[in-house]
């Protein structure tokens, strides 16, 4: 085990790493959450392939300053602050938090970062309304598949009509013979 200073340096390095890698970072006040609610929330984040952690405000401030963030972000590091990280789907952490807030009053949004840009509570709520990455991919694939499917139906209908016409000509020739 290292000294307390080394542990704090590790935590700062971890937070900096997560802050740099995440597409979405959301800061919230969790002071009204029960242990049971906190456990439920953490499970929801895991299910959404996101992370939810609590760091000391002083360590977050050090990390944010080292990454070049100013007081516009650091001012939110007051009181109990939890952090949600979204790596693959930038919408997932916002969806989880906003959805959770509908049934649990013990948590409130402070601010967030989307691709390194500071966003407000209203912008986080708007982000939560967007479709997830999976939904967008499904819609895109569906819209690409639809014209191909329609083309197959049109071509098979045309081919069927040609076969009927050829069959009619064949039957006419047989009747004449």
From Swiss-Prot:
<dbReference type="GO" id="GO:0006412">
    <property type="term" value="P:translation"/>
</dbReference>
<dbReference type="InterPro" id="IPR043141">
    <property type="entry name" value="Ribosomal_uL10-like_sf"/>
</dbReference>
<comment type="subunit">
    <text>Part of the ribosomal stalk of the 50S ribosomal subunit. The N-terminus interacts with L11 and the large rRNA to form the base of the stalk. The C-terminus forms an elongated spine to which L12 dimers bind in a sequential fashion forming a multimeric L10(L12)X complex.</text>
</comment>
<keyword id="KW-0689">Ribosomal protein</keyword>
<keyword id="KW-0687">Ribonucleoprotein</keyword>
<dbReference type="GO" id="GO:0003735">
    <property type="term" value="F:structural constituent of ribosome"/>
</dbReference>
<dbReference type="Pfam" id="PF00466">
    <property type="entry name" value="Ribosomal_L10"/>
</dbReference>
<protein>
    <recommendedName>
        <fullName>Large ribosomal subunit protein uL10</fullName>
    </recommendedName>
</protein>
<comment type="similarity">
    <text>Belongs to the universal ribosomal protein uL10 family.</text>
</comment>
<dbReference type="InterPro" id="IPR047865">
    <property type="entry name" value="Ribosomal_uL10_bac_type"/>
</dbReference>
<dbReference type="InterPro" id="IPR002363">
    <property type="entry name" value="Ribosomal_uL10_CS_bac"/>
</dbReference>
<keyword id="KW-0699">rRNA-binding</keyword>
<comment type="function">
    <text>Forms part of the ribosomal stalk, playing a central role in the interaction of the ribosome with GTP-bound translation factors.</text>
</comment>
<keyword id="KW-0694">RNA-binding</keyword>
<dbReference type="GO" id="GO:0015934">
    <property type="term" value="C:large ribosomal subunit"/>
</dbReference>
<dbReference type="InterPro" id="IPR001790">
    <property type="entry name" value="Ribosomal_uL10"/>
</dbReference>
<dbReference type="GO" id="GO:0070180">
    <property type="term" value="F:large ribosomal subunit rRNA binding"/>
</dbReference>
<dbReference type="InterPro" id="IPR022973">
    <property type="entry name" value="Ribosomal_uL10_bac"/>
</dbReference>
């Amino acid at each position: 085990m290292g000294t307390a200073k080394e542990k704090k340096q590790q935590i700062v390095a971890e937070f900096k790493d997560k802050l740099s890698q995440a597409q979405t970072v959301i800061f919230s006040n969790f002071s009204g959450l029960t242990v049971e609610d906190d456990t439920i929330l953490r499970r929801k984040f895991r299910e959404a392939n996101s992370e939810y952690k609590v760091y000391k405000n002083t360590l977050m401030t050090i990390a944010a300053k080292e990454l070049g963030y100013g007081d516009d972000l650091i001012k939110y590091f007051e009181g109990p602050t939890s952090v949600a990280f979204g790596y693959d789907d930038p919408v997932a952490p916002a969806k989880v938090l906003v959805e959770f807030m509908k049934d649990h009053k013990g948590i409130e949004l402070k601010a967030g970062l989307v691709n390194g840009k500071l966003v407000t509570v209203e912008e986080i709520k708007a982000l939560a309304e967007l479709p997830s990455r999976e939904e967008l991919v499904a819609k895109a694939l569906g819209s690409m598949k639809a014209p191909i499917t329609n083309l197959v139906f049109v071509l098979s209908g045309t081919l069927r009509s040609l076969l009927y016409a050829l069959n009619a000509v064949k039957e006419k020739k047989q009747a004449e013979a």
